[in-house]
């Protein structure tokens, strides 16, 4: 995709995967190890729906819809399931078909009260699915996913407008949560 910066400069941003067709064996080998979350605490290569095209039959066959309990970052859970079910996909590396503009009000950049609860729900729903699959062990990625969102939420608390005491209280609640302890 084309990343458009605030001052108007732009550059081509690509995923750290090779261009071309991925069959199920290649998906298991190359994509599954980072499907949900990479070791570097970055999203997996398929976790944004805005840079993927899906066949309607595929979505219907696997009953893929957005999780109505996950209000923010819902493309993460959707794309993790889609990536798991995919028998193949084709990556057009080097094609800037989408222009991504910086938006300071997005959930990834702005504080949202209740975001931690939403992310815990998302992680719980991911566990409900991936804990029952047998062809790959996603447990470490699920833990990294929880750690990523804890860091994300704690970083955004500083933008909340809350007092320093309230910010500390919110951060302690996240740090002491059972969900993070299990990660």
PLM-predicted stretches and their roles:
Residues 1-116:
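Donor-binding/catalytic cores of nucleotide-activated saccharide
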Residues 92, 122-125, 149:
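Amphipathic, well-ordered alpha-helical segments in soluble domains
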Residues 115-119, 163:
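Residue-level preference for long, well-ordered alpha-helices that form the structural scaffold
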Residues 117, 139-145, 167-172:
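Short, charged, amphipathic alpha-helical segments
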Residues 128, 158-183:
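Membrane-interface aromatic/basic loop that binds lipid-linked glycans or pyrophosphate carriers
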């Amino acid at each position: 995709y084309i990343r458009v910066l605030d001052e108007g400069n732009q550059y081509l941003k690509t995923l750290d995967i090779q261009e071309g067709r991925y069959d199920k064996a290649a998906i298991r080998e190359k994509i599954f190890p980072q499907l949900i979350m990479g070791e570097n605490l970055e999203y997996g290569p398929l976790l944004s729906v805005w840079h993927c095209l899906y066949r309607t039959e595929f979505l219907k066959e696997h009953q893929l819809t957005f999780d109505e309990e996950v209000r923010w970052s819902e493309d993460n859970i959707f794309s993790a399931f889609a990536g798991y079910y995919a028998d193949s996909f084709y990556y057009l590396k080097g094609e800037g078909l989408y222009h991504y503009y910086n938006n300071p009000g997005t959930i990834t950049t702005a504080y949202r009260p209740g975001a931690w609860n939403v992310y815990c729900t998302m992680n719980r729903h991911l566990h409900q699915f991936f804990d029952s699959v047998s062809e790959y062990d996603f447990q470490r990625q699920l833990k990294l996913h929880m750690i990523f969102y804890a860091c994300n939420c704690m970083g955004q608390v500083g933008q909340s407008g809350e007092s320093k005491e309230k910010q500390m209280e919110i951060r302690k609640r996240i740090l002491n949560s059972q969900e993070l302890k299990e990660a």
